[in-house]
């Protein structure tokens, strides 16, 4: 899922959908996919905040349980390069909407996640245009 979040913030449609297809092929639970994606985006928000305040990615560890999970913050730092704060905020909002849809909608989970991926990609691309 770390690769998926990286593809999303980079605006890489093909890679994002290939990775999502692979996760569904492996029978990953949609709510688990969404949870892992949300975690990756929260990591990126925390790292972005630390960097904007003159710190390092490691400083973001004080905002969550990262003991033994330093790799998540390193990956978040790689993914967040060049991603505006507004994209991260919008992405968190989209993730929340998808979470509510997965938990309270009769739509197929795959449709909800496909729509989420499209919206996250559009958010990333719009800011780079």
Where are these regions (language model features)?
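Helix-rich C-terminal "collar"/helical-bundle subdomain used as an assembly and partner-interaction module
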Residues: 3, 9-129
């Amino acid at each position: 899922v770390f690769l998926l979040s990286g593809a999303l913030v980079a605006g890489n449609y093909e890679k994002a959908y290939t990775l999502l297809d692979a996760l569904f092929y492996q029978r990953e639970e949609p709510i688990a996919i969404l949870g892992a994606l949300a975690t990756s985006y929260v990591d990126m928000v925390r790292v972005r905040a630390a960097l904007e305040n003159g710190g390092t990615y490691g400083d973001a560890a004080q905002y969550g349980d990262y003991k033994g999970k330093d790799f998540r913050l390193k990956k978040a730092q790689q993914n967040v390069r060049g991603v505006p704060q507004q994209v991260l905020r919008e992405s968190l909002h989209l993730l929340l909407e998808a979470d509510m849809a997965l938990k309270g909608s009769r739509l197929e989970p795959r449709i909800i996640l496909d729509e989420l991926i499209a919206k996250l990609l559009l958010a990333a691309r719009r800011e780079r245009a």
